[in-house]
C-alpha cells in the first residue's frame, strides 16, 4: 500500500492563536534587569526600543494570544506548511526509525523567520512607526523582515554580520529587492561599529555586535523608529509556535507521535517554534517527548556556556537577560551557519534547559554539511546550513535506533532552504570546510568578564 508522503492542512486549520509556554513552565523565567538599577525592566523602559504590543507579549503569562486577522491573512501566503515523511532519507540510512520534517523553507523568504517578521511589522505599523532597524546573521531574518516591512510600508535598515554579508550576497539582494537598506556590521554608521573596527579593522562581526548597531540607530529617533529582533526574546519565540501547533495536528494525521523533536539552535526561535507545542503535551498530558536543541560546536552556549545574566548585545544597549551564555564579547568562529553565531540563549529556553526539560547537543560543521548533502540527495531540498544541524542530529538518532534495533519516530524542523548558501556546499564538496571549536580558555575569558554585571 502506498504510504502518504506529505501531510497538509487547509487554511481553515491554521492556528488562530500563538502558544505562550510561560503559562505552563514549572519555573518561570527570571526577569530581564535594567543594567543601571539591576531591577526588572519596565514597559516604559522598553518602549523606546520595541512596539508597545510586542512588549505586552514579551511580559505576558497568558497561555494563548490571538493572532490578528491582518497577520493571518499574510500567513496564508505560505501557511500552513507541509509535514513531510523523509522516506528517502530513511531508506538511505537503512533505519527502522520514522523520520518526519516540518518544511518551513516554503515561505517567501525561504525560512521560518516570516512567522515573527509579519506580526512585528504589523504591530509597529499599528503604532505609527515609520522606520525599523534590525540585525541579521545569515540574512534569513533580514530578508524576512524586509518582506514584512515592505508589506506595511515601513522603511528598514539592516545590519548584516560581515562574514555573512561577504559569504551570502544574494540574500542581501533579496533585502534590497524588498526595499531594505543593508550594510555590513561592523559599520561606520554607529559608534558601536566604529569602536569594533578600531579594535580590529578586520573584524568579521557577530550577531551581538549587529544588535548593538541596530539598537543604537533606533534610539537616535525615538519619535518614529523602533528596533526588531529575529530570535531570543519571548515575543519572537511566541510567534514561531504556529510551526509546532500545525505539526501536532499533522502528526496526528500521520497517526504518529514523535519520540523526539529536534531543532537547530542559535537564539531559540525555530527550536521553540517546533518544540514548545510538544513540550505542552509533556506538561499537560504527561508525555515523555524528548525536545532537543542542536547548536554548532563553534558557538556552544547551551552545551559549554553558563547560566548568568548577560547583555544581549556587545555594546550593552539591551537589558541584562538571564541566559546560557558564552559572554557577550565572545567572537564566534566564521562558520557558515551564520544564523547560529549568537553568544546566548533566550531566557525561556535557558530556564527550560536549567530545569532539565529540554536537551542540547553540539555538532561539528563538516558533519552538518555532510548531512545536508545527504538530505538534498534523498529528499530533494538543499537545506540551509543552520537546518543541517537538526538533520545531522536526526541522522545520529536514526542510526542509533538502527544499532539498537528499535523503531523511533523523529520529527525535526527544516527551518530554511540553502539555495542562497551554496558557497558553504561548494567549500564542503571541495574538501575545504573545517571544524571550529573554541578552547575552554577562550570561553572562560569572556564568561569571566560578566562577574561585574550583577
Predicted regions and their residues:
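Positively charged, low-complexity intrinsically disordered leader regions
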Residues: 3-129
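Active-site/ligand-binding loops adjacent to catalytic centers
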Residues: 64-66, 190, 196-235, 243, ...
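Active-site-proximal loop->helix
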Residues: 141-204, 301-311, 422-430
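A short, small-residue-rich loop immediately preceding and capping a beta-strand
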Residues: 116, 124-163, 257-271, 291, ...
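Active-site nucleophile and cofactor-binding loops and adjacent substrate-binding regions
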Residues: 103-114, 132-141, 233, 262-267, ...
Amino acid at each position: 500500500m502506498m504510504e502518504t508522503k506529505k501531510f497538509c492542512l487547509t487554511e481553515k486549520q491554521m492556528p488562530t492563536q500563538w502558544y505562550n509556554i510561560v503559562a505552563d513552565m514549572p519555573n518561570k523565567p527570571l526577569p530581564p534587569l535594567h543594567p543601571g538599577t539591576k531591577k526588572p525592566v519596565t514597559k516604559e523602559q522598553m518602549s523606546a526600543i520595541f512596539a508597545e504590543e510586542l512588549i505586552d507579549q514579551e511580559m505576558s503569562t497568558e497561555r494563548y494570544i490571538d493572532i490578528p486577522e491582518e497577520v493571518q491573512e499574510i500567513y496564508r501566503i505560505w501557511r500552513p506548511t507541509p509535514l513531510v515523511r523523509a522516506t528517502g532519507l530513511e531508506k538511505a540510512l537503512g533505519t527502522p526509525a520514522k523520520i518526519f520534517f516540518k518544511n518551513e523553507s516554503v515561505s517567501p523568504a525561504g525560512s521560518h523567520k516570516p512567522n515573527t517578521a509579519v506580526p512585528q511589522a504589523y504591530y509597529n505599523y499599528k503604532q505609527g512607526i515609520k522606520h525599523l532597524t534590525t540585525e541579521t546573521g545569515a540574512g534569513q531574518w533580514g530578508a524576512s523582515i524586509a518582506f514584512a516591512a515592505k508589506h506595511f510600508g515601513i522603511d528598514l535598515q539592516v545590519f548584516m554580520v560581515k562574514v555573512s554579508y561577504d559569504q551570502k550576497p544574494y540574500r542581501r539582494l533579496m533585502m534590497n529587492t524588498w526595499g531594505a537598506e543593508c550594510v555590513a556590521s561592523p559599520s561606520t554608521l554607529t559608534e558601536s561599529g566604529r569602536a569594533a573596527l578600531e579594535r580590529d579593522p578586520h573584524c568579521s562581526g557577530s550577531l551581538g555586535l549587529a544588535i548593538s548597531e541596530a539598537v543604537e540607530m533606533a534610539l537616535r529617533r525615538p519619535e518614529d523608529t523602533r528596533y526588531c529582533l529575529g530570535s531570543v526574546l519571548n515575543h519572537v519565540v511566541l510567534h514561531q509556535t504556529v510551526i509546532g501547533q500545525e505539526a501536532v495536528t499533522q502528526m496526528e494525521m500521520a497517526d504518529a507521535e514523535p519520540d523526539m523533536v529536534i531543532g537547530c539552535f542559535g537564539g531559540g526561535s525555530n527550536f521553540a517554534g517546533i518544540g514548545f507545542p510538544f513540550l505542552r503535551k509533556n506538561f499537560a498530558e504527561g508525555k515523555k517527548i524528548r525536545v532537543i536543541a542542536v547548536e554548532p560546536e563553534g558557538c556552544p552556549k547551551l552545551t559549554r556556556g553558563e547560566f548568568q545574566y548577560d547583555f544581549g548585545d556587545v555594546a550593552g544597549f539591551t537589558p541584562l537577560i538571564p541566559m546560557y551564555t558564552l559572554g557577550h564579547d565572545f567572537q564566534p568562529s566564521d562558520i557558515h551557519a551564520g544564523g547560529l553565531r549568537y553568544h546566548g540563549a533566550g531566557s525561556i529556553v535557558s530556564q527550560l534547559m536549567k530545569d532539565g526539560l529540554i536537551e542540547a547537543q553540539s555538532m561539528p560543521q563538516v558533519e552538518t554539511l555532510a548531512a545536508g548533502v545527504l538530505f538534498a540527495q534523498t529528499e530533494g531540498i538543499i537545506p540551509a546550513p543552520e537546518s543541517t544541524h537538526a538533520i545531522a542530529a536526526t541522522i545520529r538518532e536514526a542510526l542509533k535506533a538502527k544499532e539498537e534495533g528499535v523503531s523511533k519516530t523523529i520529527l525535526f524542523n527544516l527551518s530554511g532552504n540553502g539555495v542562497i548558501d551554496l558557497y558553504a556546499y561548494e567549500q564542503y564538496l571541495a574538501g575545504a570546510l573545517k571544524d571550529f571549536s573554541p578552547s575552554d580558555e577562550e570561553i572562560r575569558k569572556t564568561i569571566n568578564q560578566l562577574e561585574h554585571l550583577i
